[in-house]
Amino acid sequence: MANYYTDIPELKFHLNNPIMKRICELKERNYRDKDEFDYAPLDFEDAVDSYDKVLEITGEITGEIIAANAEGVDEEGPHCANGRVEYASGTKQNLDAMVKAGLNGMTMPRKFGGLNFPITPYTMCAEIVAAADAGFGNIWSLQDCIETLYEFGNADQHSRFIPRVCQGETMSMDLTEPDAGSDLQSVMLKATYSEKDGCWLLNGVKRFITNGDADIHLVLARSEEGTRDGRGLSMFIYDKRQGGVNVRRIENKLGIHGSPTCELVYKNAKAELCGDRKLGLIKYVMALMNGARLGIAAQSVGLSQAAYNEGLAYAKDRKQFGKAIIEFPAVYDMLAIMKGKLDAGRALLYQTARYVDIYKALDDIARERKLTPEERQEQKKYAKLADSFTPLAKGMNSEYANQNAYDCIQIHGGSGFMMEYACQRIYRDARITSIYEGTTQLQTVAAIRYVTNGSYIATIREFETIPCSPEMEPLMSRLKKMANKFEASTNAVKEAQDQELLDFTARRLMEMAADIIMCHLLIQDASKNPELFAKSAHVYLNYAEAEVEKHAGFIENFDKEDLAFYKK
């Protein structure tokens, strides 16, 4: 049977990135748990070996159970009866296997029953699971909501909720409402404090809630009477054991059928405040969403990998005109670009995850003791890098998942349009990735300030100073010219001093920055392991160079007066 970890050597390469040593030192607090927990690592090598073993177990479960159940789960789906969700039979089997393997609460401290894993190896597990079944990946990976409760909840909440998640209970984040989608400041679910009950009571409706009948919910609700903006919103914890929330219906979706997307009705549902009042949206949901966006980036890479695998296997097997179709330039061109996008997107994903790991670990240490000046500087640096890279990782990988799924079907030809092949499920599942947890357009809104304030170009110029192998030098020379075009395009838009023009060109500028950054990451990877990455470095740079040229040409030739032609 396939192992979704060991079959992909690129994952082990990213696990062994040199930055992991610093991440492990911070996460393990210099390996202080070794005297208290027999499964805690003794040193860096022991920690990475532990991550590797858990990833191998995840890959085995994914290959033997989750992938095997994927088609059946897609067809059966979950059901709603008497206000409750019943998972598909295959989903129950998947969850049971993951719980028995101890793959829940992975990033939580060991004192709560977690594995104390950094974000990076956990994200690899999320990618692996999504490659087999993106719908199940949603249910399982929502465990990362516990990060927000851990970060902002109190000690009592930690002791009551975190061990339950580590033991396999599920989570959801209840944000969206019928009239509050991307515009979350419009949330109107009402939270009223009851002196009689000594808790908050929630009333209203939530919509499009992934895994909406979860055991533990993080809920965004309006706690401040008379407010209508984000400052009136707080974050609450709802425990299903308390009752008061019913599933009105499960949405009939295009894809991710295994994941129940629910409409929820709150009727005096007892809940407790998480953190401080009024900070629900402006602080806690922003942290929650950044974690979710990294998760969707991982899901997208998993889907890209699945699409590439299916396309490659079919192209090798299918014969036309006396030879396998993979031998035709039109087909091997598509496959090479699919692999280039996959490798580039994965490099961006794990670079982002490593940035998140360092600043999150330092944040956690700061709750125990005062950081040194050097640590504060390190925390600030990596928090900024994580904030700037997250919208790129989510935005680009979700678009690439869709593009790779599209090309996978194209490689299959007429067979790809039939329901018998997995490519149709991958295509349907991929479509949501560029929509939920913030559309690509909203990722552009998040990213554009890092274009205009010079963060991306500064990172790119820093990457230019990193030595590369002699074989990669010609690519680096071309890449520097691409960066010059990006910088010139950015300056041209900024000098126009027109906000509407900036908003209009933002997507192009974001993609230019992302393409150049991903090329740098691939060149760095190919310099260390040419066997794995040299081909993709060449293919992706050719692709990205044309994309940057296209966007630069558009911006150079565009007159802001032409905006009128685009408006209805």
Question: Which residue ranges define each predicted feature?
Answer:
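C-terminal helix-coil-helix/basic helical segment that borders enzyme active sites and/or dimer interfaces
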Residues: 343-394, 490-504, 523-531
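C-terminal amphipathic alpha-helical interaction region
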Residues: 454, 466-568
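Internal helix-loop-helix
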Residues: 59-60, 90-163, 167, 210-212, ...
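A glycine-rich, basic-preceded beta-loop-alpha segment at the flavin cofactor/substrate interface
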Residues: 241-244, 248, 260-292, 309-326, ...
